[in-house]
């Protein structure tokens, strides 16, 4: 069994870690520090930390690994392999050079497309029909290392970030499991990326979350599902933020962008920049719980038709 240091943070990483624990000797786990979560700001450990502790594996949580005392500790462990999956930090060269089999990353896109921290979100927002997972050697430049293996998966019309996240986390763990024997034996492929074909998926900003109603209905729909259920697209009703969790396209209903054209028992119909509208079917107003739009409409007293979402 190979001695592996694993680095990752969110739920996406846990499936890869669980596979490595079953197949190899995971000698340490590195993850982000515990963070405050929710309205009450409760300090919460990363999902990867919980898996590691359940399996008796030592955990390191440097704020920035390149400036941490943990860096030399990890190098001194003399790992055979470093594996990362959604770790969230670029590793210093001294750490990349430490393992004799190299440092590899499980990335949730078909590189060189969608380098960066939000590849699942961006692929859906862009209306891509497929995405996938890449196993790659790590390099000092973000997501630019040589490709070892890739596997594609379809993005279906009703997929959102949550559903694709789940599919890709299982796919990533499975592809790495298939690829590991070749990496350990030194028989794996090593294909340089074409930097000219690289696209980028930067972390989602607050401004990225806001809906632009002048876009087409298809673009708005992709934007909503590409941010659902996190970090969530939003718009404004009067002066109140409205988060948008689910929607569908209403073909052949044209109106001014952002104008509420009608309400049904289950949806708010909103005009876009194309000849089709968007039906909002699951929402959350500021200070309220997430709910089906039907529940919101049953208790809302004002007439929404004619109001403008901004």
From Swiss-Prot:
The keyword Transferase applies. The lineage of its organism: Bacteria, Bacillati, Bacillota, Bacilli, Bacillales. Keywords: Protein biosynthesis, Transferase. Attaches a formyl group to the free amino group of methionyl-tRNA(fMet). The formyl group appears to play a dual role in the initiator identity of N-formylmethionyl-tRNA by promoting its recognition by IF2 and preventing the misappropriation of this tRNA by the elongation apparatus. The gene is fmt. (6S)-5,6,7,8-tetrahydrofolate binds at residues 109-112. One of its GO terms (cellular component) is cytosol. Pfam families: Formyl_trans_C (PF02911), Formyl_trans_N (PF00551). The keyword Protein biosynthesis applies. It comes from Staphylococcus carnosus (strain TM300). CDD domains: FMT_core_Met-tRNA-FMT_N, Met_tRNA_FMT_C. It is an enzyme of class 2 (transferase). Belongs to the Fmt family. This is Methionyl-tRNA formyltransferase. It catalyses: L-methionyl-tRNA(fMet) + (6R)-10-formyltetrahydrofolate = N-formyl-L-methionyl-tRNA(fMet) + (6S)-5,6,7,8-tetrahydrofolate + H(+). One of its GO terms (molecular function) is methionyl-tRNA formyltransferase activity. Its EC number is 2.1.2.9.
């Amino acid at each position: 069994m190979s001695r592996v240091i694993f680095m990752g943070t969110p739920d996406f990483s846990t499936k890869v870690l669980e596979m490595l624990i079953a197949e190899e000797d995971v000698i340490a786990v590195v993850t982000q520090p515990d963070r405050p979560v929710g309205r009450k700001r409760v300090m919460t450990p990363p999902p990867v930390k919980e898996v590691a502790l359940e399996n008796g594996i030592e955990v390191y949580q440097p704020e920035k690994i390149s400036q941490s005392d943990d860096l030399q500790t990890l190098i001194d462990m003399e790992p055979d392999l470093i594996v990362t999956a959604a770790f969230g930090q670029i590793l210093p060269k001294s750490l990349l050079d430490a393992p004799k089999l190299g440092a590899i990353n499980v990335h949730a896109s078909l590189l060189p497309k969608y380098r960066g921290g939000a590849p699942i979100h961006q692929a859906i927002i862009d209306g891509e029909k497929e995405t996938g997972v890449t196993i790659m050697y790590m390099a000092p430049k973000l997501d630019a290392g040589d490709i070892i293996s890739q596997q594609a998966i379809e993005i279906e019309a009703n997929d959102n970030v949550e559903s694709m996240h789940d599919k890709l986390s299982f796919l990533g763990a499975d592809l790495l499991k298939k690829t590991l024997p070749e990496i350990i034996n030194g028989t794996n492929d090593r294909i340089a990326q074409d930097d000219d074909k690289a696209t980028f998926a930067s972390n989602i900003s607050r401004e990225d979350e806001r809906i632009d109603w002048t876009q087409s209905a298809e673009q708005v729909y992709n934007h909503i599902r590409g941010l659902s259920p996190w970090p969530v697209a939003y718009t404004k009703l009067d002066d109140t933020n409205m988060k948008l969790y689910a929607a569908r396209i209403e073909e052949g209903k044209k109106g001014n962008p952002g104008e509420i054209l009608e309400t049904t028992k289950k949806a708010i119909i909103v005009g876009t920049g194309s000849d089709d509208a968007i039906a909002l079917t699951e929402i959350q107003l500021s200070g309220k719980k997430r709910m089906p739009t039907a529940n919101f409409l049953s208790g809302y007293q004002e007439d929404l038709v004619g109001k403008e979402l901004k």
